[in-house]
Amino acid sequence: QPNTPARQKTNDFFVLFKAAQELRPHFENEVLRYLATFESAAPRNTLKGASIKRLARSRQKTAMDYGGDAAMLKDLLRGSVICSDVDDFAKCFRGLAQLERDGVVSIVIVKNRVRDGALASGYIDANCIVKFRDYLVEVQLHLADIVAVKKEAHGAYEAGRELDLMGALAEPPEETPRSHLALNAARLVVLGMCLV
């Protein structure tokens, strides 16, 4: 069913939150630590390890993006691996494929912004939704240089997300003077937030 959106096995928010808490150490040990060392002489940074999305942000995302359907929340449990360069990034993808061959995860969705192009904000990374022990979790792969820039602008990103400006940063489907003006205004708001 290629057009069916990926969903958790339940839409009970509290069941999902409890499962994320129980799965967290296993996800850390079986997935993130494996990726941190796969084809690497020295372990890669995994930022803060496996983390659970904050309750308030999870509820907000469920309400704003998924019409209240918690089964659509695929990144409640997530973890990041920092790659030194594009070659290292490719190694992490090979590691994820190996985890799938070994039956540890099943890859469900891959958004590879290194290969496919940056977000409207200019950010590039890869977000992989995988099924791990019957739940959907997110593996984020980042490039070290991009993470350094992201740290500087994260406050502006969060403010833009809260104001629902991120979609406004994308190129308008049709070029009209008004759409171009709105696009530039949204970009200036985020730029201004970065400078504060």
Question: How does the language model describe each region?
Answer:
Residues 1-73, 90, 151, 163-195:
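Charge-rich, low-complexity segments
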Residues 62-192:
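Long beta-strand-rich cores associated with HINT superfamily self-processing modules
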